[in-house]
């Protein structure tokens, strides 16, 4: 007889009722065992990222099931590409994504900090302290750390371009582009300042387009004050350069109208076929005439058109670009002050945009070509055009630039800064440890554990730089306490000074606050889980 897979209880009248079904088909772990399992999974993920922290951090190579290779040291990208099975490890992936979505930078640091907090929490659990007490203590310690960050922060002059470039260089220092650090930092700053509204402290990232083309060197990367699209003129004999162009942006196809309903066309003679061909030709000519009469000197079409239409456009001296995607159409309309026209009959002079220069740019021996629309009336649309030896380098350069753009955007939003090299975390750790001495309850243990976890950031920076981590950290801590200078950090690039203010290693207060807050919240969530039930037939890391 098959054993029942449900848990049964009986009421006072002896009637059975089911409490939980499929008990035997579930795997269950509870209590301290569950918490420790989760801590182990989260720490495993954090340790993977630990070696990628800082300017001397190492890259990771990630190969997808399809064979696509990604080489990166961007925390969010590593986490996204990792095939994580354990559900708590997936929380760490989401943590990195949250930091990337909200701030854009600090995605590696936030995961490393969360892993260190969980490591310290495990030690406290082994000493018999309840996980909720630990979580409550971490929350209070987090509040104290954030207060310390606020007190040591400096006001940043956003109008000073040179200081902005220095901040972007800090973000780019650990990336593949660090050999062209200054150039990429200037590109990032100029791109953000081009689209930023300083008064409302707003930066519209949709106005910054990133394009890449394999070939050339990273140093060939440029910022174009306009739009670059991966298209060419539709006919090889059309002009490769237009000055003071009047641009018509069309979302209607260059073809005869088609019936909306199902239809059948009977062609029984050559005369019928000629009549059909003549009708198509007349339709094309009417459409071209309408565009020409509006005063347009360049037609940009969302849809394609056949060779006959292309020939007629060339014959009528009307340059055209076909198959331009929706996002590019919108950017072009904003940049040129054009209206997007859905029907030829609606096209008029008022709906045209203007561009001072439209030109095809060529690359390499193969003469790859792209179209550049520059000198537009609305200069709040720019394109960062990235070059590199292969697609992997270009993709990683784009990710690096994205982080730098986010850092500059955050400074426009909130101009307060702290100094890097682990100096801010160490200053916060010193103050949290001091606060622990003033607390009577069990939370004091959590405060000290939180301080130790904060020290994991400068320690990881020292490890990745080839320094003796414990010696470097103890010396640095003693100097900070002795001098009271919160800008003393790990000299990861061997510049000869520990003062990050002198080295111009700058990080945004917004990013640091978010890292500590998010890491503490996720750790609290993990510590509060004490019972896990998973289907026994699924492999989920348990």
Curated annotation (Swiss-Prot):
Spans through the membrane: none
Primary location group: cytoplasm
Intracellular or extracellular location(s): Cytoplasm
One cellular-component annotation, GO: chaperonin-containing T-complex
Pfam families per the UniProt record, alphabetical: Cpn60_TCP1
GO molecular function: ATP binding; ATP hydrolysis activity; ATP-dependent protein folding chaperone; unfolded protein binding
Keywords annotated in UniProt: ATP-binding, Chaperone, Cytoplasm, Nucleotide-binding
Keyword Zinc assigned: no
GO biological process, one term: protein folding
Chaperone in keyword set: yes
CDD domains the UniProt entry points to: TCP1_epsilon
Subunit structure comment from the entry: Heterooligomeric complex of about 850 to 900 kDa that forms two stacked rings, 12 to 16 nm in diameter.
PANTHER family hit by this protein: CHAPERONIN
Entry similarity comment: Belongs to the TCP-1 chaperonin family.
Stated role: Molecular chaperone; assists the folding of proteins upon ATP hydrolysis. Known to play a role, in vitro, in the folding of actin and tubulin.
UniProt-recorded name of the protein: T-complex protein 1 subunit epsilon
